[in-house]
């Protein structure tokens, strides 16, 4: 059965998903939704003529999708996901599920109420390098020390993207959901303590947000981990890409020889 899918958000991730749906025979794109010109540019890139929508509610009602791919800014995730479930569609949504814990709980409740699938884009769970990294790290004994970061010296277009993201959330929330999920896969123990620090290094973001942060997490088997993320042209490129796990029996790391602090190296 071909799945009719509505793609909401036509930026980096939305365009990537649309490219896949365009090429996979099991999917039929029934619409592209965005607030700007990105949907038209995506149609050109795909050499397609998919229906284009400015308004998400109109797109849902008109296209009647089997599933919705939500790749918009995080402050819309909760509302868009609940609307999709209320329309009877399955949902694939980019991380984070919502920009608050209570928002995420409301999305989950809507999924359960509708009986439809809710899938969050935890890409690292399917990445061969990360699968091997976790498999090897679990052989290092316990407790583990898990050190991870991704600092991005973003400029120009990417700094615009990051500033827009920081209107609703911080770097450690946007990216950290990946790495806390990874830490939970390294150890089957229960997280028991979380703390964090942060700093606002620019006036270009809301006063109540920060563009540099580090969180620390402790598990009940004695394992500990930290994750650090910073965005902006002021960020240092020294030790900006750390993916490292240490246990009683040794250590394992991901070394990105060609990673760029201003690129997309998750």
Predicted regions and their residues:
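Contiguous beta-strand/loop segments that form the cofactor/metal-binding neighborhood of enzyme cores
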Residues: 180-259
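Short, Asp-centered acidic motifs that coordinate Mg2+ and/or phosphate
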Residues: 31, 67, 145
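Hydrophobic residues in well-ordered beta-strands that form the structural core
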Residues: 54, 93, 118-120, 227, ...
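N-terminal Rossmann-like dinucleotide-binding module
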Residues: 1-47
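Beta-loop-alpha module in the N-terminal Rossmann-like domain of NAD(P)-dependent dehydrogenases
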Residues: 17, 38, 50-110
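Rossmann-fold dehydrogenase core element
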Residues: 106-123, 141-148
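Predominantly a Rossmann-like dinucleotide-binding segment in NAD(P)-dependent oxidoreductases
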Residues: 124-206
